[in-house]
Amino acid sequence: MAGNSRITEKFEYKTNILTSYDGHEQRIKTRQIPRHSLSYDYDAMTTFQAQWLKGMTRIRQTDKYYIPMWHKVVYLNEDFVEHGKALYINTDYMYNLEGCEWIEVFVRDDPLQTGINLVRRVDHFTNNAIILKKQIDRPMYKANCWIYPLIECSIAPQDNLQYVFANGAGLTMNFEDLLNEPRIHVPNNYRYEYDEGYYWWQLRDSIVKKEKLTTEYLKTKYPTLYKEAINKGLNPEDYIMKSFGGKKVYRDWEHFNRYNLPSTYNGYEILWHEPWWIDDDASSLSIEKNTNRLDNETGNFVYDLKNSNSYDTIAFETYMGNVKMVNNMIKFFNRMGGMFRAFYCPTWVNDFTPKWGIQFGKNTIYTELTVTYKMYATNTRKKSIVVFTKDYQSYIFDVAAYATEEIDGKWYGKIVLAKNSNITIPVERIEMISYLDLVRFSDDALTLNYEANDVANVTLSMKEVDDIN
């Protein structure tokens, strides 16, 4: 468990990696379906509860159980009519049901214990509903109904039961998903792809052509729609967006892909998540050099340079603020297959300090000269950079070479681009210039630490690779 997290979910693949002398990798995916495990913290405050936890530590290891996934709650989108089989749900939570054959429905769950809970078997999923095998003979209302997916699992050997007083105890219970068939899958559009909806900045780019959405701009560009919004007491920006078919329903705290990065580059996906800089160690960088140390233990030693490339390992902690962000992270990890596939990820730090802006038709970026230019000159790996701007845009450039140049008696670093720039970016508009590294996950396991049913954090670690060569 990480920090104060009470619920932990883990997905784990298995990848065999063969590394050649020059650092190139050949990766073999040996597990097609990831192992899935859960950890829940249970607190017992009565003798009965404490004895129940004690009993759970002594059960036969071969016993199987269905457990609710408490962090994957699903909500009704409309009231349920009795004698029906279709539960129409909020589709934001559809992916929570992936692979589940059974569900548990809590109705009017309150401290007075006047509610009930029902267990039902799933027949299939549609784009907006759970279709049950048997009907439910009572009405249910979306305001006081919760649906939890059930998974068949075994209970892993438990840690020690911790007593806090004579009648109270605590235990972290670890459950291992048995991954038994049949597994009922949600529709493919929920199962595989990013569930993005419309982003505010995508609508801004497509509708108002990158103009700032100031009040004066909206008044001038869309006077009729602006007046309609004011007359109805609505936010003009929201009203105008919806008039063009946009749904301002998914903004992910306004920080998920806030720099409008593309989804792919050079045929590889781009990871949009970025560090949140909450803790002092929120992001880190370690560097692996491809060398051998030759040491005969007599005192003298030398290093044998396999190649002049170094390999960065980027690690950072990121938070996911709603269910779509959490599920997008899981989907991305599954598409990568753990360490198997490579993808692009920005370093999210200032790797270069620009001296002047980027000019249209030019293929050079002048920066402050640092000692790292010596490393750049010897590194033979092709790299890319991404320029983040203060108006939340991003521009990717391939680097052809590095050089230095003396201008007016002062030396500057010079990034030589593979192509001439097709845009002018003034220096005062640049937020930072980061490397866009081609990486893979450095671990086959993804561990999500939940702070609420739709809020989680994860620490990602990614190692630079040479796949593009």
Regions inferred by a protein language model and the residue ranges of each:
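Extracellular/virion structural assembly segments
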Residues: 1-128, 134-469
